[in-house]
Structures are given as structure tokens and as C-alpha cells.
């Protein structure tokens, strides 16, 4: 098992949870129990332009927290190594629940409630279902990314296409070998 250092604390990596536009997220074990360690990467992304990814994550976390968006708590930041330690939210992602037919209707209802917080603040989040976990009856957004509102990328026009058995979701699953 690999060990990651964050501000002098050791975290033993259990597994890769996922790779996003901005980094790799690992399930890790620390003295406080299971956590997520996100390592910022600098790999190119053809459809998204970043400035300082770490500062963007921190700014977006503060913005979304102030709105009351349920997210994992930010536990530590190591600016030198570009790593974040986040609360681990256990359970299957919304995508995994869609694939097994176990996503309850309350998940989409809660997503629409989140939109009622985001849109007046002129913000969108990444609505893709891998970014959400329903835990303890609460829908958590496990990413920290937010962007200025644009109707073409809001939940109704973009995100909802991936929250049901749609041609877009089936194409994504096939492209990523998950069908």
C-alpha cells in the first residue's frame, strides 16, 4: 500500500476512488479513520480550463459551504504537495445506484433542492452522478467544483441526462467500459 503525506501526517492508500478533471481521489486510512486524499494533477483537460486548481478547490469549497450544499468536510490542505484531505462519505455513488436500479426518487428531489440554492447564486456544479452519494438520507456533493451559471450546463439541460437510463448515460457507460 502507498502512503501519502499531508502536513506531516501519514495516510495509507486503500484504493483509487476516481480521477477527475482536477485530481485523483484516494480512499485512505489516517489516524482519524477513513478519509479521502485528493492529489491535484496537472494533466490536460480538453474541455475545461483551470487556473490554480488547488486554490479553485478551496474557493469553491468556501462558496458552496456558505450556500449550505451538503459536502464532505475539508479536513486538511497541504499547499506544497497540492493535496486535500476530505471527510469520507461512504456508500455507492448515484451512478452506481443508477446501474443497480437502487436510486430512490428522493435523490433527484434533493438535487432539485440543491439547484434552488445554486441558481439564485448564479452557480452550477458538476451534476455528473459520480459526484454524488446519498448517505444517511442526505445527498452529498463529493466534489467541490462550481462554475458560473450557464443554462446549457444546469441540471435540467445537462445533468438530468445522466441521472436516468438515457442514451447519453448509456453512451458514457459504454465508452468507459461500465455497461
Q: Language model features by range: what are they?
A:
Residues 1-14:
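Juxta-kinase regulatory segment immediately upstream of eukaryotic protein kinase catalytic domains
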Residues 13-16, 21-54:
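ATP-binding glycine-rich loop module of kinase domains
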Residues 49-67:
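The N-lobe alphaC helix and its flanking beta3-alphaC-beta4 segment of protein kinase-like domains
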Residues 69-107:
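Conserved structural core of kinase catalytic domains
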Residues 106-114:
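Conserved alphaE helix
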Residues 107, 119-124, 134-179:
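C-lobe/activation-segment region of protein kinase-like
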Residues 127:
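Hydrophobic HxD+1 residue recognition
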Residues 130-131:
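Conserved protein-kinase catalytic-loop position immediately C-terminal to the HRD catalytic Asp
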